[in-house]
Amino acid sequence: MATYSSNDFRPGLKIMFEGEPYAIESSEFVKPGKGQAFARVKMRRLLTGSRVEKTFKSTDSCEGADVVDTNMNYLYNDGEFYHFMHPETFEQHGVEEKTVSDAAKWLQDNAECIVTLWDGRPIAVQPPNFIEAEITDTDPGLKGDTAGTGGKPATLSTGAVVKVPLFVQIGEVVRVDTRSGEYVSRVK
């Protein structure tokens, strides 16, 4: 794998640091008036999702991580693992529940997700940016009830709870942004 100098750090670059893969989120190169130049880096630990701030000297370097983002289709959950399949090779991967974490509430059958593989092992799952799901439970919207914020909680067929406008009813299909968890529109 390639070696990257701290001068080459860019957002999106995946490196090995302390034996684990990290994704660089931001990098600021600083040249003080006195002393050696350095890079102030914010990065995310891919195995846990935690964020780390680290300062690298200009002479430091890190090896590139052998991490691959792959589009895969979500198949099913057997209670212990979430199963994904590569659409071209039909290779299947079982992903542990702790790895899927918050993405689980957005998963629908055959949804195309981005699965991050490290040494052939799934370490992260990113759901599609937008999903269309049916509303299974919400309060009825009463005519003239517009005082307040103008929204009500609704449970989707995936199990996620989102805030929707008062006019949305049970059985309607809505479009939701999975990155923010916000209602986008009704689907006709």
Curated annotation (Swiss-Prot):
The modification N6-(3,6-diaminohexanoyl)-5-hydroxylysine is found at K34. InterPro entries: Elong-fact-P_C (IPR015365), NA-bd_OB-fold (IPR012340), Rib_uL2_dom2 (IPR014722), Transl_elong_fac_P/YeiP (IPR020599), Transl_elong_KOW-like (IPR013185), Transl_elong_P/YeiP_cen (IPR001059), Transl_elong_P/YeiP_CS (IPR013852), Transl_elongation_fac_P (IPR011768). One of its GO terms (biological process) is peptide biosynthetic process. It comes from the Bacteria. One of its GO terms (molecular function) is translation elongation factor activity. It holds the Pfam family EFP. Pathway: Protein biosynthesis; polypeptide chain elongation. Involved in peptide bond synthesis. Alleviates ribosome stalling that occurs when 3 or more consecutive Pro residues or the sequence PPG is present in a protein, possibly by augmenting the peptidyl transferase activity of the ribosome. Modification of Lys-34 is required for alleviation. This is Elongation factor P. The gene is efp.
